[in-house]
């Protein structure tokens, strides 16, 4: 039986931290769906289509990863995709508390959906998309946190290139 995992998130933008978690998940499961949430309430910098396109570009080296956009309840999306594993990156205790609640809510709606928590590599444990956007808005160098194509797209969005 093939195992299919979903790694959901807003990925606004996708960072080396996300790619670190995704790469390790791709080594653990037959198929990993990088599921990019529309997340309109978060007022994303990039449209869903842009985030999907950037993610596809920077994950080409992972043959068992598929990038898809979605805009529904994660548990329902997982059922439709016939996925039984939900991948989540956990950087801190506060992340874990939130993820634990989310895992229990997902399990309420999809009892066969198990959450697997992965810790980022130590050098990426402080990286978050929102922090990187803030650094970029204040003219900080974000090139060590983002693939070049993503950094370029972000700087263009900010009118800095």
Swiss-Prot record:
The keyword Lipid metabolism does not apply. The gene is coaD. Pathway: Cofactor biosynthesis; coenzyme A biosynthesis; CoA from (R)-pantothenate: step 4/5. Substrate binds at residues 10, 42, 74, 88. The keyword Isomerase does not apply. Signal peptide: none annotated. It is an enzyme of class 2 (transferase). PANTHER family: PHOSPHOPANTETHEINE ADENYLYLTRANSFERASE. Its cofactor is Mg(2+). ATP binds at residues 10-11, 18, 89-91, 99, 124-130. Homohexamer. Its main location: cytoplasm. The record marks 18 as: Transition state stabilizer. It catalyses: (R)-4'-phosphopantetheine + ATP + H(+) = 3'-dephospho-CoA + diphosphate. Its EC number is 2.7.7.3. It comes from Proteus mirabilis (strain HI4320). GO terms for cellular component: cytoplasm. This is Phosphopantetheine adenylyltransferase. GO terms for biological process: coenzyme A biosynthetic process. It comes from the Bacteria. The lineage of its organism: Bacteria, Pseudomonadati, Pseudomonadota, Gammaproteobacteria, Enterobacterales. It is found in: Cytoplasm. GO terms for molecular function: ATP binding; pantetheine-phosphate adenylyltransferase activity.
